[in-house]
């Protein structure tokens, strides 16, 4: 494990860096700053970040097959045209809950965009409980709700055989598994896969590797952990130099690099002095495992 290398590749400090997605065609990393209300794109070649400022918190962003991106922003699924920075609302959710916003999301292997909601944070990781839901945006822009009574809807991904959806509601301190019907996009039979240890922090964003193991970024835990879904056991921990690790994805030319986003919101001056690169983006190499290319939204 001594070959693992961790470097801060984007030192700009984002309030809540999240939703990293590798965009293969340009070799760039897409991500959001949730409360900074931005979608950003980092080019490893130029080491520059371009960003688009938005009018609401943006929980997640995904690639779109027809070009541009789709965001889970505020209480909307919205399209973003990167060239002219225009935003088009596709549909709204949770209209009876004005204090709710979207959080993490990801596209399933068939091109549907799943994203969940939560109430706006009172302070980091403190929310009005049970206000969120998990939704699917279908390619025809219709929306289906999977379930409600969620605290902080967070990381999700699918098993390599596409039969299982892995899902995190952060304040349950668990990673759950659900049966997933890839034909219809419906989920059922939710159960606990892994319960986090106290020192591991709060489960946040998540991705799967090419060996079918899950990687979970642990907020306030300063680490990503690797979980074997077959055994429900944690099999690896990689610690980072910042506590507020938020999400992770694989990227790079062969998907052998892991990118980890982080946050600085809610940190006092003394904490920031100790961890000045909180809110930056980290690259981990030498993990010895590759990731899976993200799917683009089909609609």
Curated annotation (Swiss-Prot):
Positions of the catalytic residues: 204
Function: Gluconolactonase with low activity towards other sugar lactones, including gulonolactone and galactonolactone. Catalyzes a key step in ascorbic acid (vitamin C) biosynthesis. Can also hydrolyze diisopropyl phosphorofluoridate and phenylacetate (in vitro). Calcium-binding protein. Modulates Ca(2+) signaling, and Ca(2+)-dependent cellular processes and enzyme activities.
Family assignment from sequence similarity: Belongs to the SMP-30/CGR1 family.
Annotated metabolic or biological route of this protein: Cofactor biosynthesis; L-ascorbate biosynthesis via UDP-alpha-D-glucuronate pathway; L-ascorbate from UDP-alpha-D-glucuronate: step 3/4
Protein name as catalogued: Regucalcin
Sites where the protein binds a divalent metal cation: 18, 154, 204
Listed EC numbers: 3.1.1.17
Amino acids binding substrate: 101, 103, 121
GO BP, one annotated term: intracellular calcium ion homeostasis
Subcellular location: Cytoplasm
An MF annotation (GO) of this entry: calcium ion binding
Organism of origin: Xenopus tropicalis
Ranges in a coiled coil: none
Keywords, sorted A to Z: Ascorbate biosynthesis, Calcium, Cytoplasm, Hydrolase, Metal-binding
An annotated GO cellular component: cytoplasm
Cofactor stoichiometry and binding remark: Binds 1 divalent metal cation per subunit. Most active with Zn(2+) and Mn(2+) ions. The physiological cofactor is most likely Ca(2+) or Mg(2+).
Cofactor(s), by name: Zn(2+); Mn(2+); Ca(2+); Mg(2+)
Reaction equation(s) it catalyzes: D-glucono-1,5-lactone + H2O = D-gluconate + H(+)
């Amino acid at each position: 494990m001594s070959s693992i290398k961790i470097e801060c590749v984007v030192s700009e400090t984002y309030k809540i860096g999240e939703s990293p997605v590798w965009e293969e065609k340009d070799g760039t990393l897409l991500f959001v700053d949730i409360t900074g209300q931005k979608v950003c794109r980092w080019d490893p070649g130029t080491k520059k970040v371009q960003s688009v400022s938005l009018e609401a918190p943006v929980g997640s962003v995904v690639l779109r097959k027809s070009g541009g991106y789709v965001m889970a922003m505020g209480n909307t699924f919205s399209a973003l045209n990167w060239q002219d920075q225009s935003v088009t609302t596709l549909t709204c959710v949770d209209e009876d809950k004005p204090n709710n916003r979207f959080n993490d999301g990801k596209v399933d292997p068939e091109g549907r965009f799943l994203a969940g909601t939560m109430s706006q944070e009172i302070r980091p990781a403190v929310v009005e409980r049970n206000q969120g839901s998990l939704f699917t945006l279908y390619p025809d822009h219709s929306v289906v709700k999977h379930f409600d009574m969620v605290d902080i809807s967070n990381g999700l991904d699918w098993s390599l055989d596409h039969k299982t959806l892995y899902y995190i509601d952060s304040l349950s301190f668990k990673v759950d598994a659900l049966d997933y019907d890839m034909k219809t996009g419906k989920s059922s039979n939710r159960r606990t896969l892994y319960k986090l240890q106290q020192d591991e922090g709060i489960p946040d964003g998540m991705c799967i590797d090419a060996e079918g193991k899950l990687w979970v970024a642990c907020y306030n835990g300063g680490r990503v952990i690797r979980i074997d879904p077959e055994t429900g056991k944690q099999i690896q921990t990689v610690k980072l130099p910042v506590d507020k690790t938020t999400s992770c994805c694989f990227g790079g030319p062969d998907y052998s690099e892991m990118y980890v986003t982080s946050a600085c919101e809610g940190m006092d001056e003394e904490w920031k002095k100790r961890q000045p690169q909180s809110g930056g983006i980290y690259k981990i190499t030498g993990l010895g495992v590759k990731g899976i290319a993200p799917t683009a939204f089909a609609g």
